[in-house]
């Protein structure tokens, strides 16, 4: 049961071969067995999940089922879900019970999907290793001594360990794609504004975007059909005609132009990862694609630009956590100002504090022009680089991450080294483009352990259907997306 695609599961549910209650219980049993070690979930509520499964079975019996009705989906703990604890991986929201559903949760509920639980994440989505969570680090199912990536590391580990059929994530600078790469699954960050941000706890509002994490491009296309659409409650939501993201699946890739940015294959890319990506490019050649070289000259500026803009927005967004209206409040304080200081000092972890300090600094009167304004100008240049590249090609291919999964704690005391994990993904967020990672093979770590490698596919604005087809066609001639970690009983 746990190795079937979303479409296969939907067919099995429709034919009454299995019930949603049985499927949900199977995943809950696996969570009880494996989650104490992997730590992919922060909150599981079997009573709520099974009630949704019973309702889904009734919908199926009534002939009112959609493609995801009855299918258990894990939700990143950044989305408010009514009646569920919603922590964002932080002590600040340790006991916060959401009073309403996020737009994304509403859409899955309307589709009849089952909320299997809330997945672990880097605190307030700030991290690339899922080591900053107040609720403990997440283990990579491929090697328990390694990180799953972040910030959507819990969702990635849950999908990889077959603790859910699929999951949601959010991506501010690579937080869907990088963990998808490190855990050997597929993940998609849609064009900025396609998926509702209503009820999604904000990190950097001009960069955050929700997206699917699953085993295959086909599974992600089905999820995109549910997740995307205009939401008037979200000021960044785009009004566009509803799309069917499965419509391109299976189309020939003959004649499609694929761009390879030379900057993505320069110094800093692990040799084993480079070899896997080159093999994937060769596969696309065999499928009829035309390979062209493109240039993204401002790529290397994306990290410093991001670490000015994202912390600036975070320092503003996180100012609401003051211990007054909701969130952690210090037990002892002398006056109101002391309460603010102690509540925030106790409630936020070190990485969150670091980014708030950076953001406050770059927004200060003496440095606004030198840092924040300059970063916005370079952000525009990065977007223009992509626009020029897409005049020469239809899709851009490259590595998702510069290396395979690293050891837990290896980069914990070196923030710059950690930040460089997103060197190939951040520019996509800065430009607002869609980006996707799919499994492309395995490469050896320094100790010889073979670990998953992700291939990144970048498209032009609103070109998700073409990207998903490119991933789907590749997955029809390879089996990387079907591989399972050892020790994960099927």
Swiss-Prot record:
Reactions this protein catalyses: L-glutamyl-tRNA(Gln) + L-glutamine + ATP + H2O = L-glutaminyl-tRNA(Gln) + L-glutamate + ADP + phosphate + H(+)
EC number: 6.3.5.7
Keyword Zinc: no
Entry annotation: catalytic residues: 76 (charge relay system), 151 (charge relay system), 175 (acyl-ester intermediate)
Gene3D superfamilies: Amidase signature (AS) domain
GO biological process: translation
Alphabetical list of Pfam families matching this protein: Amidase (PF01425)
Transmembrane segments: none
Record keywords, A-Z: ATP-binding, Ligase, Nucleotide-binding, Protein biosynthesis
Subunit structure: Heterotrimer of A, B and C subunits.
NCBIfam families reported for this sequence: gatA
Full protein name: Glutamyl-tRNA(Gln) amidotransferase subunit A
Origin species: Methylobacillus flagellatus (strain ATCC 51484 / DSM 6875 / VKM B-1610 / KT)
């Amino acid at each position: 049961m746990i190795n079937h695609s979303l479409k296969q599961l939907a067919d099995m549910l429709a034919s009454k071969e299995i019930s949603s209650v049985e499927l949900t219980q199977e995943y809950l049993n696996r969570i009880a067995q494996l989650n104490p070690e992997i730590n992919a979930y922060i909150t599981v509520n079997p009573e709520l999940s099974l009630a949704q499964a019973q309702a889904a079975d009734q919908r199926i019996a009534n002939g009112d089922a959609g493609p995801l009705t009855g299918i258990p989906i894990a939700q990143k703990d950044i989305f408010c879900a009514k009646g569920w604890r919603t922590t964002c991986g932080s002590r600040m929201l340790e006991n916060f019970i959401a009073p309403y559903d996020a737009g994304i949760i509403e859409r899955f509920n309307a589709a009849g999907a089952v909320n299997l639980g809330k997945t672990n994440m880097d605190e307030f989505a700030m991290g690339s290793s899922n080591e900053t969570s107040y609720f403990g680090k997440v283990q990579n199912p491929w090697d328990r001594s390694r990180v799953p990536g972040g910030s959507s590391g819990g969702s990635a580990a849950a999908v990889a360990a077959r603790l859910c059929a699929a999951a949601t994530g959010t991506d501010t600078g690579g937080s869907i794609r990088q963990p998808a790469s490190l855990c050997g699954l597929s993940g998609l960050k849609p064009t900025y504004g396609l998926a509702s941000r209503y009820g999604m706890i904000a990190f950097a509002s001009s960069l955050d975007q929700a997206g699917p994490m699953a085993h295959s491009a086909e599974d992600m296309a089905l999820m995109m059909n549910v997740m995307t659409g205009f939401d008037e409650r979200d000021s960044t939501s785009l009004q566009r005609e509803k799309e069917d993201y499965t419509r391109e699946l299976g189309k020939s890739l003959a004649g499609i132009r694929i761009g390879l940015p030379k900057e993505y294959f320069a110094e800093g890319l692990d040799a084993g990862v480079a070899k896997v990506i080159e093999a994937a490019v060769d596969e696309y050649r065999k499928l009829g694609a035309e390979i062209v070289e493109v240039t993204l000259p401002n790529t290397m500026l994306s990290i410093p630009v991001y670490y000015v803009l994202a912390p600036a927005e975070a320092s503003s967004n996180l100012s609401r956590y003051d211990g007054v209206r909701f969130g952690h409040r210090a037990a002892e304080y002398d006056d109101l100002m002391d309460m603010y200081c102690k509540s925030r000092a106790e409630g936020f972890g070190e990485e969150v504090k670091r980014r708030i300090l950076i953001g406050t600094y770059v927004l200060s009167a003496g440095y606004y022009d030198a840092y924040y304004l300059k970063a916005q100008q370079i952000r525009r240049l990065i977007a223009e680089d992509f626009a020029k590249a897409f005049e020469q090609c239809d899709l851009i291919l490259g590595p998702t991450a510069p290396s395979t999964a690293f050891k837990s704690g290896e980069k914990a005391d070196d923030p710059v080294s950690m930040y460089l994990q997103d060197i190939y993904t951040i520019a996509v967020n800065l430009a607002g483009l869609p980006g996707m990672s799919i499994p492309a093979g395995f490469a050896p770590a320094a100790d010889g352990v073979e670990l998953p490698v992700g291939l990144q596919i970048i498209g032009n604005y609103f070109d998700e259907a073409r990207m998903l087809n490119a991933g789907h066609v590749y997955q029809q001639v390879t089996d990387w997306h079907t591989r399972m970690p050892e020790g994960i009983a099927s």
